[in-house]
């Protein structure tokens, strides 16, 4: 493969990665359906906690280093493999600090020690796969990176299906299959990274990637904002589940998790938009006029997506979710309906979509620490809202506690939206569309609350479709100027 063909391409790579994410999410959804039907609700909730707990803890081992490799690797593809090896060395040293914590967690859960050990292993394997997958992307082979993700999910889902066909209800067996899929994904990523990046001159060192790679200290300092952000970001979607597990039990965690599944799938939309917008903003951050033009266009697209997402999400969940999951998650047996909880979470989805411009502006800006500050603020607010609202709800009923968990998630999404606008200095732009912003948020809240209560007030959401034409027009404007992005990439 020539150096030219190995150059990353925004358009090509984003299509491969987005497509793989969609397929992986669909396969993961099928896997969750199998788990929900194969396991008791308590076992299912325990499985979720075991995976989420170590995934959240060990994500700190990432250290933000793969992000640096993705940024600096394309400038010198021959040094990508040495850079990846250096990342593994630093992450290995960091693991020595986390090993005692992992051992303590396993020992404190003596009745579930095997499951906890498997959860820790899955998390470690996933962390180990970040560097080779990033190496593939930096070398211009996002296609193979995408295949590793899809194959991992295929293996896991097939394994779940085999166990389900054998009428297995052993949560440890399902966790073992999850680990097997993760290992296969890691091995494929390592094979691909070596095939593309590992056959060059062995004398090349990672220091040629840039000045920040001159020493371990400079690497860690340069990666620190990314490391902190990666370390705390997962808590945003998991805090409510941890608090529910503490206040109530694993049955309630399982129900809230089912409601979150479709919501998380919907978050692929803002995630894809951030990925597409970031290189555009990064290339134009020294041109304030053009920078603001991009943000304005994307903001109009976001407004146009809100009504489409609300209708699509509500329709899909209303029809398909009860078909896939057991009736106990919807008939009130566990204290609430996952469908009604999802309708409340839709408010947070809309706010997350609307936060894309300000969120990405902070990522692309000259002061990445402001982005870290935003994420810290969101996590702190999510914790405070969760402890207060879920605690108050638990004093009344299980159903109200689960509902309050959804409202806590919505509140943290609102903090992310408004905090991003303030920190990115876009409050004046916000005020220019002040009436549109306030009206949109008000109608979204009324619509989603009405959907959760199955009220005719949900029809007020149809008013949001007045935003669709401006979104379509902005999308045409953005798509009509791809040459600018190609020029930026070439430079």
Name each region found by the language model:
Residues 1-27, 192-193, 206-229, 292, ...:
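N-terminal membrane topogenesis motif
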Residues 9-66, 99, 122, 157, ...:
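Signature of the first transmembrane helix
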Residues 12-25, 50, 55, 59-110, ...:
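Membrane-water interface segments that mark the loop-to-transmembrane alpha-helix transition
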Residues 24-28, 32, 50-70, 118-137, ...:
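Short runs within selected transmembrane alpha-helices of multi-pass transporters and secretion channels
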Residues 69, 134-138, 142, 162-167, ...:
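C-terminal transmembrane helix end/exit motif
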Residues 72-87, 218, 255-376:
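Specific pore-lining/lateral-gate transmembrane helices of multi-pass inner-membrane transport
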Residues 88-231, 238, 459-465:
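Hydrophobic transmembrane helix module of multi-pass membrane transport proteins
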Residues 94-114, 308-332, 386-395:
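Short membrane-interface helical motifs at transmembrane helix boundaries
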């Amino acid at each position: 493969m020539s150096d030219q063909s190995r150059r990353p391409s925004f358009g090509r790579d984003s299509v491969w990665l987005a497509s793989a994410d969609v397929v992986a999410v669909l396969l993961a959804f099928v896997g969750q359906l199998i788990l929900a039907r194969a396991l008791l609700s308590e076992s299912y909730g325990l499985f979720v906690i075991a995976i989420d707990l170590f995934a959240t803890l060990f994500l700190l081992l990432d250290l933000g280093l793969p992000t640096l490799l993705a940024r600096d690797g394309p400038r010198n593809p021959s040094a990508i493999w040495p850079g990846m090896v250096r990342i593994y060395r630093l992450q290995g040293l960091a693991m020595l600090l986390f090993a005692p914590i992992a051992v303590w967690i396993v020992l404190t859960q003596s009745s579930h020690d095997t499951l906890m050990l498997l959860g820790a292993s899955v998390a470690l394997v996933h962390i180990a796969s970040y560097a080779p997958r990033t190496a593939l992307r930096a070398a211009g082979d996002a296609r193979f990176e995408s295949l590793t993700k899809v194959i991992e999910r295929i293996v896991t889902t097939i394994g779940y299906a085999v166990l389900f066909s054998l009428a297995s209800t052993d949560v440890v067996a399902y966790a073992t299959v999850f680990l097997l899929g993760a290992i296969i994904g890691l091995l494929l990523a390592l094979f691909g990274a070596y095939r593309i990046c590992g056959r060059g001159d062995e004398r090349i060192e990672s220091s040629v990637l840039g000045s920040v790679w001159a020493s371990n200290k400079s690497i860690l300092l340069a990666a620190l904002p990314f490391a902190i952000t990666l370390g705390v970001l997962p808590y945003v979607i998991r805090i409510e589940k941890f608090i529910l597990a503490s206040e109530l039990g694993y049955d309630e965690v399982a129900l809230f998790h089912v409601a979150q599944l479709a919501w998380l799938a919907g978050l692929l939309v803002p995630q894809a938009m951030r990925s597409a917008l970031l290189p555009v903003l990064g290339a134009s951050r020294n041109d304030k006029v053009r920078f603001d033009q991009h943000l304005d266009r994307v903001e109009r697209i976001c407004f146009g997506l809100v009504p489409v997402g609300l209708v699509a999400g509500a329709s899909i969940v209303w029809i398909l979710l009860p078909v896939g999951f057991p009736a106990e998650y919807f008939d009130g047996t566990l204290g609430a309906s996952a469908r009604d909880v999802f309708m409340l979470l839709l408010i947070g989805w809309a706010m997350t979509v609307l936060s894309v411009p300000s969120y990405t502006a902070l990522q692309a800006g000259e002061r990445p620490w402001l982005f870290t500050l935003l994420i810290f603020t969101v996590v702190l607010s999510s914790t405070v809202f969760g402890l207060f609202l879920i605690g108050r709800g638990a004093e009344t009923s299980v159903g109200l506690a689960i509902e309050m968990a959804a409202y806590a998630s919505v509140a943290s999404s609102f903090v992310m939206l408004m905090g991003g606008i303030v920190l990115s200095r876009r409050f004046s732009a916000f005020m220019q569309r002040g009436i549109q912003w306030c009206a949109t948020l008000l109608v979204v809240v009324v619509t989603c609350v009405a959907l959760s209560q199955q009220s005719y007030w949900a029809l007020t959401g149809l008013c949001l479709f007045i935003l669709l034409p401006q979104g379509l027009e902005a999308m045409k404007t953005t798509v009509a100027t791809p040459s600018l992005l190609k020029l930026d990439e070439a430079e």
